[in-house]
Amino acid sequence: MVKGYDLPKTVDKNTLVVITSISGNTIETLTTLESATKKDCSVIAFSSGGSMESFCTKNNVEFRKIPQIHSPRASFPSYVYSILKTLNSIIPIKKQEIINSLEQLELLSKEISSENLSDKNLSLNLANWITGTPVIYYPWGLNTAAIRFKNSLQENAKTHAIIEDIIESGHNGIVSWERPSDMVPIMIEGKDDHIKTKERWTILRQYFEENNITYKEISSLDGGILSKIMSLIYLLDYATIYYAARLGIDPSPIKSIDFIKERL
């Protein structure tokens, strides 16, 4: 995955490059698109339009238009499933797993909806629990959900957040807890984490408890990796919106991002 301006030097005419930008105007993504085209790569691009659509039309690049829903953040699920459908021949996710993940999301939507403000609403519970700067721990395979949670906290609740790989944290990050701070640990755990990863979760809990550090645990649902990731993202996204509401913050405006975009 490329998040900057440069493609790896190994990319050539035998490489398939998948370009995504929900707005179609992300500067670094457009730069990558232009670079991939110059390298004569096989390219397919996804966006709601913008400069990306114009470039693809002009340069005869394969393009799929996916409507934007409210904002890029809100459009994420529709983009994931649309891209999976288009690339089903090369992405090894079975149709049944996609169906299962959608069914899980439908069930979860009822549990975390604003129409259910009970203690059974996991998103609301998490939002009410956060009191400082979240430090989000995640295992291998669920890093996508952790990154999305961090990004959504920053955009929706205008709150700083940190992510920590559970294994890597045992080599460095754990030491940071030796000093008092407003950090609050949130542990995103996978139902089928490796047995040694589960051992690390147990040790981390023990460390927090012995040092009187309050923590929160969020477990993935059962099922395939797509169900796990999409359900976690849905649950955690809702938590950031509830948290923003609790802080009296409107999740929609992103003035700081606009500040940067206007100067690029």
Model regions and ranges:
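A short, glycine/Asx- and small/polar-enriched loop/turn
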Residues: 11-15, 131, 233
